[in-house]
Each structure stands twice: as structure tokens, then as C-alpha cells.
Amino acid sequence: ASRRGRRGAEHDARPELRPDVSTLLDVDREYRSKAASGALRTIAPRRFNPGKQAWLPVLHTERTPWAFTALYSNTARADELGTTGDWVVIYFERDGREGQCTVVTERSGPRAGQRVVRGREAEDP
């Protein structure tokens, strides 16, 4: 699925239009486990990769009725904070509706050290 045109879809609050937090955290767990074991295909990101090396693992998976693509965040902010190997961006699609979210390790508060879906911290997994 194309990443274009996804902006804004992740902010739609109707639950049927976005995966629940527990599903997203399960995709995050699968991605980080397979990435750590070297079981995923890698791609060469365009940004912050002057040598054009294929180092970024990519997961394509499904949890009916959702299709997911997960990869580590390769943004300037993630690079600056040293969280490239922690922040996981998950793209999702269902019935033509697309969106994305970011899963991170919470650094403070009652959920410090836990994986959370950024922007949906108040939702129980």
C-alpha cells in the first residue's frame, strides 16, 4: 500500500477505522522480535543513509481484517534522539482506509519502560 494520502487517517477516532491498541502492540512485538533475529527483508532508506545500505527491516503482516507494514522510524527526530531502533512506525489498512501510528518505549510517568502507541496512551492494551 502506498504511504501517500495517509496523513490524517490516523486521527479518525472511530474505533472501527483503526486497529485497537493491543493489536498494534502485537504487531510491534512481532516486528521487533523478527528484526532482532534478522528474519526480515531489509531496505535502503533514502534519508540518513549516504552509503545507500539496506539496513532497515520491514515487516508485512495481517491481523484480520487489517493489513500492516512496520518499520523503525527513520526520521531526523528519531536520529537526533538515538531512538531509531526503538520507535516503530506501523502503517495499517482495512477496506481502503489507511493510517499510521508510532509505537515507542515510554520514558516517564506511570508507563515508563512500557511500549505505548503514541497519542493513544490512555487506552488500555
Language model segments and positions:
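Helix-hairpin-helix
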Residues: 1-7
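Structure-specific DNA junction-binding interface
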Residues: 8-125
